[in-house]
């Protein structure tokens, strides 16, 4: 592995309470494990997703996901924000599927308004606490979507796509398309590679090299959606606390212009709230 220096990290240290040594250790371990995923044959890779995350948390015990304390109020605010995007697509007959449901906080909230919900994740343990009469938990290998075909009217994922190997992402999208009902839709939220990277490699590298196996632009994700068969793709950027529908062409034009800027400028301005809101990939694809 190439040498890691401390110079690239300086500009980011103000955004974290972690030491340079802790971040460097995390970086080295995550890159090692991510490379294991990237280089594994497909039949081995599907079984590796859970394994490498378990190993990361074991070898990096001060990982932010293990040490960050999130209050109930903060967790609730995050759920409310995500529901504010989804609520316009939900009615009493909605069949909802969340990919990467985690502890199920969002799915349980949607279950108050929908007919049926599926909470899908790769971890049986993390799904064990998800209990509701209208919620069914579903275990996936990272690609499979084992729910009835043509049954889901609204699917959703939040910051999941970037963690999936590009080959697996396309297969998962095909599997997802198969379970979505005619005229049903998939809402996908993922960070934009143009103001990334957004994983631990942000401290050192111009592109994601850690567990964000591939970060996307809205244009790139639209191409994937259309490749698997979705007929319509819309953008829903967030402004002043609200998600607004916007022609995808506007977002793609902004991405094109932003992408013309030198990396150093994109790095400097890409974290400004107005730029973040415009660039966050928040798309609705309709079957």
Language model: regions and residue ranges:
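Short glycine-centered segments of the SAM/dcSAM-binding site in methyltransferase folds
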Residues: 95, 183-185
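Short alpha-helix
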Residues: 213-228
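Conserved N-terminal segment of class I S-adenosyl-L-methionine
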Residues: 1-158, 170-173, 277-281
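Short N-terminal helix/helix-N-cap motif within the alpha/beta-hydrolase-1
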Residues: 165-169, 198
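Short catalytic micro-motifs in class I SAM-dependent methyltransferases
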Residues: 159-163
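A short glycine-rich, Lys/Arg-flanked "PGG" loop and its adjoining helix->strand segment in the class I
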Residues: 170-182
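Short, glycine-/aromatic-enriched active-site segment of Class I SAM-dependent methyltransferases
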Residues: 188-212
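A C-terminal cap/extension of S-adenosyl-L-methionine-dependent methyltransferases
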Residues: 201, 233-287
